[in-house]
Amino acid sequence: MAEKIMVGMSGGVDSSVAAFLLKKQGYEVTGVTFKLWDDPQADSGCCSADDVRDAAYVCQQLGIPHYVLNYKELFRQEVVAPFVAEYLRGRTPNPCINCNRAIKFGAFAHKLRELGFDRMATGHYARCGYNAATGRWELLRAVHPAKDQSYVLYNLTQPQLELLRLPLGDYSKEEIRAIAEKNGLVVARKPDSQDICFIPDGDYGAFLRRYTGSEPPPGNFIAEDGTVLGRHKGIARYTVGQRKGLGISLGCHAYVKRIDPRCNTVELTTEESHLFCRSLTAEQVNWIAVDELTGPLTVEAKIRYAHPLSPAVISPGKTPGSVRVEFETAQRAPAPGQAVVFYRGETVVGGGTITNTEDSLC
């Protein structure tokens, strides 16, 4: 009897081809689209009517069932509210990681068991499998690095990985579009989404105003020596390393070096080299390749989604669930709130949320 697999389908080409490939492999496939967010000011973006229709139409083309699961309240609680809270604290969150943890692989895994399915799948570009030598399920980078999405999947647990299938991990984006074209899928030429799904216009400031009903309080721009340079329009508008759109002119390039929510200040530097640091601390760490970190481990680390891998040594932090990261070469502007993810070769060791950076080169 064929295994029953539930595929998360966003209405895009990746998840559509994932469903196609799994059906071709002999699975009994059902497509599921998550209803996560409604924005009356947006005609497109996360969970738009067009996306739901596209997913349903692809399922019709493939001859498989399609259902919509309403997770709007859970999404608001677990993704949107923490996103807003982090920005108001002057941090730079990655909501996709929270969404994967709480919904795409959290609530989704619970629902498929409830409905009697054997497996779950998504259209992420990554690979997973069982390592008999370690007795653990592993997460691996996609074969084609340009599209690899393992960074946003570091929070996966062993039970989730056991259930998961990632059929796109061996393919390039061009190959996926070619498969969609060849098989007449209606979404074959649909553009990729580029922004945070619930902020399709990319205007974070406007979203925060709508969500909170108020403007973030203004405060001071300060120099590295504490001198007041001018006024900012709220720390939620800035991120570490930012140069453009600061709203202040110093007669030369200036960069956000540090954001202090306690004092409501944004520290600027005119020296880009002062953004670099060699070490950081991360918390809320999730381990995949190991059960726990018991001592120093040499890895390659990535401090943001599009950042290159950098050699580092990780060691247990001072508090439970934390890790200290020492880079071989200084990294530009690691931002508190972002994820740092650790790799050994193709394998994801684990990752966590950056809380602070140390050893600035200034």
Regions found by a protein language model. Give the residues of each.
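ATP-dependent adenylation/nucleotidyltransferase module used to activate substrates
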Residues: 1-154, 165, 174-175
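AMP-forming adenylation/ATP pyrophosphatase catalytic core
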Residues: 38-39, 121-128, 132-362
